[in-house]
């Protein structure tokens, strides 16, 4: 991602409806995981550290980001253990974390299986990864190019990548679902006129007037409530996966709700 685009994202991280909505969805999923108090947590690709603020209520949080601007921003928020690193080479020991969050990072990596394998390395046995990614390659747009994405995902493609890296699937749900139809129509219209434009691709994340911002956030409030109840949404602009690091190399149970709890660090042998 270009530094100019990254700085723009940092500026809207606190205030944009999309980031607030994604944090709500994450919080809803973490409620279902019943994160034990004191769990060691890693935010992979932590950006400004805003998500680390929320995660720190659950336990000690470490973070890393490839962009030094994000690392500095997270440190300025008071997070001491934030490092400059790539998801393909995480600067932590094997089995260090009960919970790992990886929000809209995998699409930036040329080899997502390698990245998922490295994330699994630093997860403890039974540890959980919560990852979000953009959905549907057919929705590829200037926004993806501006942010140097390699791909968008379907549930099946993310599940295959996770399995290849050794993760057991726990649950998958799409989100940002209500806005999918208008967003798809808009991107189709943009694609049909793209050949007429000479401007470079640019991010579509920008601040909107307060009332519009709140209106756009409202659907994700509803979706977060549904996810908290265990309801999985069949389509959306984004996809959330919960994956578990196998204990003893066995295969996990992918039935609805199976495995949606973290190991208790007080009972762990780590």
What is each model feature region?
Residues 103-106, 132:
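Residues lining the SAM
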Residues 182-218:
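C-terminal helical/coil "lid" or tail adjacent to the Rossmann-like core of SAM-dependent
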Residues 219-256, 260-270:
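C-terminal lobe and adjacent flexible extensions of AdoMet/dcAdoMet transferase-like proteins
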Residues 167-177:
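Conserved S-adenosyl-L-methionine
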């Amino acid at each position: 991602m270009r530094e100019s685009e990254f700085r723009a994202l940092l500026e809207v991280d606190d205030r944009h409806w999309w980031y607030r909505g994604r944090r709500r969805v994450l919080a809803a999923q973490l409620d279902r995981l019943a994160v034990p108090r004191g769990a060691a947590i890693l935010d992979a690709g932590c950006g400004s550290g805003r998500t680390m603020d929320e995660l720190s209520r659950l336990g000690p949080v470490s973070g890393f980001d490839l962009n030094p601007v994000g690392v500095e921003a997270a440190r300025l928020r008071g997070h001491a253990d934030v490092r400059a690193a790539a998801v393909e080479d995480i600067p932590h020991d094997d089995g260090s974390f009960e919970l790992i969050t990886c929000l809209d990072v995998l699409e930036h990596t040329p080899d997502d299986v390698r990245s998922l394998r490295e994330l699994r390395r630093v997860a403890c046995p039974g540890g959980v990864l919560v990852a979000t990614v953009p959905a549907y390659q057919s929705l590829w747009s200037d926004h993806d190019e501006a942010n140097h994405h390699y791909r968008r995902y379907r549930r099946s493609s993310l599940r295959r990548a996770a399995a290849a890296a050794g993760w057991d699937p726990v649950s998958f749900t799409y989100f940002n679902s209500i806005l999918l139809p208008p967003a798809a129509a808009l991107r189709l219209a943009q694609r049909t006129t793209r050949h007429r434009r000479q401007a470079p691709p640019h991010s579509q994340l920008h601040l909107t007037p307060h009332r519009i911002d709140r209106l756009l956030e409202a659907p994700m409030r509803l979706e977060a409530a549904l996810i908290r109840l265990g309801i999985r949404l069949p389509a959306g602009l984004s996809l959330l996966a919960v994956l578990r690091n196998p204990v003893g190399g066995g295969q996990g149970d992918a039935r609805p709700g199976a495995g949606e709890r973290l190991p208790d660090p007080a009972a762990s042998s780590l």
